Amino acid sequence: MAPPGGILFLLLLPVAAAQVTSGSCSGCGPLSLPLLAGLVAADAVVSLLIVVGVFVCGRPRSRPTQEDGKIYINMPGRG
């Protein structure tokens, strides 16, 4: 169940949104289309690099044990 403060916040959110006038961004400049496209492309590239890094670091590796070089009489397949 949601805490009472969270419910109050959700109820007052539309009231707060109505108080904000559109275009009241202080110090914000308009984003040009090439800049916006570059930001989206850079975000996609960084996201792909993160996915590849997680895949490379997270995949299981088969490591040979130290006993692979030893030959035992009662172990078929090793010798």
Curated annotation (Swiss-Prot):
Q: Spell out the residue ranges making up region: PIK3R1 binding site.
A: 72-75
Q: How is it modified after translation?
A: Phosphorylated; PIK3R1 and GRB2 associate specifically with tyrosine-phosphorylated HCST. O-glycosylated.
Taken from the record's topology, the Extracellular segments are 19-35
Any transmembrane segments, and where?
36-56
Q: Where in or outside the cell is it found?
A: Membrane
**Keywords tagged on the record:** Disulfide bond, Glycoprotein, Membrane, Phosphoprotein, Signal, Transmembrane, Transmembrane helix
Residue spans, topological domain Cytoplasmic: 57-79
Q: Which domain of life is it from?
A: Eukaryota
GO-annotated cellular components? cell surface; membrane
Q: Which residues carry this modification: Phosphotyrosine?
A: Y72
A Gene Ontology biological process annotation? positive regulation of phosphatidylinositol 3-kinase/protein kinase B signal transduction
Q: Where is the signal peptide?
A: 1-18
Family annotation (InterPro entries) = HCST (IPR009861)
Instruction: Decide whether keyword tRNA processing is in the record.
Output: no
Chief site of localization: membrane
Q: Name one Pfam family in it.
A: DAP10
- Identify its membrane topology class: Single-pass type I membrane protein
| UniProt note on tissues of expression | Expressed predominantly in lymphohematopoietic tissues.
Q: Which GO terms describe its molecular function?
A: phosphatidylinositol 3-kinase binding; signaling receptor binding
- Region called GRB2 binding site, residue ranges: 72-74
Function recorded in the entry: Transmembrane adapter protein which associates with KLRK1 to form an activation receptor KLRK1-HCST in lymphoid and myeloid cells; this receptor plays a major role in triggering cytotoxicity against target cells expressing cell surface ligands such as MHC class I chain-related MICA and MICB, and UL16-binding proteins (ULBPs); these ligands are up-regulated by stress conditions and pathological state such as viral infection and tumor transformation. Functions as a docking site for PI3-kinase PIK3R1 and GRB2.
How does this protein assemble? Homodimer; Disulfide-linked. Heterohexamer composed of four subunits of HCST/DAP10 and two subunits of KLRK1. Interacts (via transmembrane domain) with KLRK1 (via transmembrane domain); the interaction is required for KLRK1 NK cell surface and induces NK cell-mediated cytotoxicity. Interacts with PIK3R1 and GRB2. Interacts with CLEC5A. Forms an CLEC5A/TYROBP/HCST trimolecular complex depending almost solely on TYROBP. Interacts with KLRK1. Interacts with CD300H.
Q: Which family does it belong to?
A: Belongs to the DAP10 family.
Q: What is this protein called?
A: Hematopoietic cell signal transducer
Per the record, the gene is HCST
